[in-house]
Amino acid sequence: MMHENPIKRRPSRRLYVGNVPIGDGAPIAVQSMTNTETTDVDATVAQIEALAQAGADIVRVSVPTMEAAEAFKQIKQRSPVPLVTDIHFDYRIALKVAEYGADCLRINPGNIGHEDRIKAVVDAARERNIPIRIGVNGGSLEKDLQEKYGEPTAEALVESAMRHVNILYKLDFYDFKVSVKASDVFLAVESYRLLAQKIDQPLHLGITEAGGKRSGAVKSSVGLGMLLAEGIGDTLRVSLAADPVEEIKVGFDILKSLRIRARGINFIACPSCSRQEFDVINTVNALEERLEDITIPMDVSIIGCVVNGPGEALVSHVGLAGAKNKSGLYIGGARQKLRLDNQNLVDELEAQIREQVKFIEANKIDVKEING
């Protein structure tokens, strides 16, 4: 059912974004970012609530103007999860949102300004126990680094990050995390690997501007998966040109696939072939949609025939092995006398899964949620 993963997490410092622990073995936090106009308070709060419902631990909000900062004050008061404020160009906005209760300040070294401005932000953060995220991006490196390296390289991204890491160290401020994002998978991966060797701050992972719902999910899964499998990463965001809720779903799917952190059902399903005794694809799609509300981690196998069906079912919390007219049901790896009608599989299997969820909750059974 949920096998241990062999990943050894990279040691890192502990900090807190609101009440969410980051680093030092804490569960890898999944976050997204709103794409509403921040000045539209109701729309932004509604999106934050939808993200929280999907499982977001943290939500980032862009605050590009002082008007947006004033709106953030109201948003923060209504948010069900900690909020990171995304600040570019004007350090004074960071000072204002710190005053209004931001849970983390994200600044970009490439455009926030001189060291004295960074010091002002650090002083505000220190006074209110707010962590900072140094966010380096391959598309917005400092001009001198662009000239030095000619193009974004891992060395350039890490040099940019280390400049500002060292400024914070010099200011005796250690409550920060770092990201070195790029849209190219290999560039991002190499940048994070290099940075991980230099500092013990928590690392926020991401492949920036990854793409649309499908291509972005694939690119992020490959890049973040490589790093996570090496034990690198303490929080992540999957960047998609799509509904931000999809970012949370993909983020948890990545962690679930690596057995790092489980949330909801892990469906194990065959791609189907002429041996299938029922419509596997439509059955799985329907159940994924119907069972999105379940947060308990479970393995559910849905296999269309008896070649691999029984074997997968033996290591699943709930399993279905296709057979003619009625398919075999397995609970906790044990075959049941009850067989499910192939003509009504979605309803019957959903009922069985929900019964198992109730049983687990009522008996407080440990379903082995692995938090790495």
Curated annotation (Swiss-Prot):
Biological or metabolic pathway of the protein: Isoprenoid biosynthesis; isopentenyl diphosphate biosynthesis via DXP pathway; isopentenyl diphosphate from 1-deoxy-D-xylulose 5-phosphate: step 5/6
Residues binding [4Fe-4S] cluster: C270, C273, C305, E312
Textual note on the cofactor: Binds 1 [4Fe-4S] cluster.
Biological process terms in GO annotation: isopentenyl diphosphate biosynthetic process, methylerythritol 4-phosphate pathway; terpenoid biosynthetic process
Entry superkingdom: Bacteria
Record has 4Fe-4S as a keyword: yes
InterPro entries reported for this sequence: Dihydropteroate_synth-like_sf (IPR011005), IspG_bac (IPR016425), IspG_bac-typ (IPR004588), NO2/SO3_Rdtase_4Fe4S_sf (IPR045854)
Enzyme Commission code(s) on record: 1.17.7.3
One annotated GO molecular function: iron ion binding
The keyword Lipid metabolism appears for this protein: no
Named cofactor requirement(s): [4Fe-4S] cluster
Sorted UniProt keywords: 4Fe-4S, Iron, Iron-sulfur, Isoprene biosynthesis, Metal-binding, Oxidoreductase
Catalysed transformations (reactions): (2E)-4-hydroxy-3-methylbut-2-enyl diphosphate + oxidized [flavodoxin] + H2O + 2 H(+) = 2-C-methyl-D-erythritol 2,4-cyclic diphosphate + reduced [flavodoxin]
Similarity field: Belongs to the IspG family.
Task performed by this protein: Converts 2C-methyl-D-erythritol 2,4-cyclodiphosphate (ME-2,4cPP) into 1-hydroxy-2-methyl-2-(E)-butenyl 4-diphosphate.
Name of the protein this chain belongs to: 4-hydroxy-3-methylbut-2-en-1-yl diphosphate synthase (flavodoxin)
Organism this protein belongs to: Idiomarina loihiensis (strain ATCC BAA-735 / DSM 15497 / L2-TR)
Gene: ispG
